[in-house]
Amino acid sequence: MELEAVLKERTAAAGDPGRVLGAWVRRGWATAGPGVLESDGGSGGTLAFESTSSSRILELTSDNDPEYEALPEGSNVTAHMLAGAVAGVMEHCLMYPVDCVKTRMQSLQPDPAARYRNVMDALSKIVRTEGFWRPLRGLNVTATGAGPAHALYFACYEKLKKTLSDIIHPGGNCHVANGIDNSCPA
């Protein structure tokens, strides 16, 4: 049914791909539920949505919504470093067993009679045959190095993001500054 509608629009557009794409997007927004029709010019404060059941416009303001992408306003470099260190150590502690399994599966990958079918099978066989602590072997060294590395990275990222945001768009959050900051390794 969806294919028939697309083909019908293609023949009606007679070679104008912009019309086909525009009609397809409009139909997608209408069938998927409320879609974004307009915004207030990029300030991020107000968005207008149209309900599919009626033609009324609902206005939503996000001025009072909490921002989860940043630490509180008065945060200093120490808070950013602590947050980065904790996040980095936790990430390595959670992902280290998976990385251990990935390394083993990659070393056995070309063999059709490989010992492991999937990640969970590999992890259970490693724990059963070599002991519970085997997938965590070497984690202490990795976590010790991850703390300072992630602390420095996170603090540099936040400082550079704040500096670029103040230069490009004073008093607010600038997505261009965040993009530039993400492209520059610390």
Curated annotation (Swiss-Prot):
GO terms for cellular component: mitochondrial inner membrane. Keywords: Ion transport, Iron, Iron transport, Membrane, Mitochondrion, Mitochondrion inner membrane, Transmembrane, Transmembrane helix, Transport. It is a multi-pass membrane protein. PROSITE patterns: SOLCAR. GO terms for molecular function: ferrous iron transmembrane transporter activity. Gene3D superfamilies: Mitochondrial carrier domain (1.50.40.10). It is found in: Mitochondrion inner membrane. This is Mitoferrin-2B. It comes from Xenopus laevis. The lineage of its organism: Eukaryota, Metazoa, Chordata, Craniata, Vertebrata.
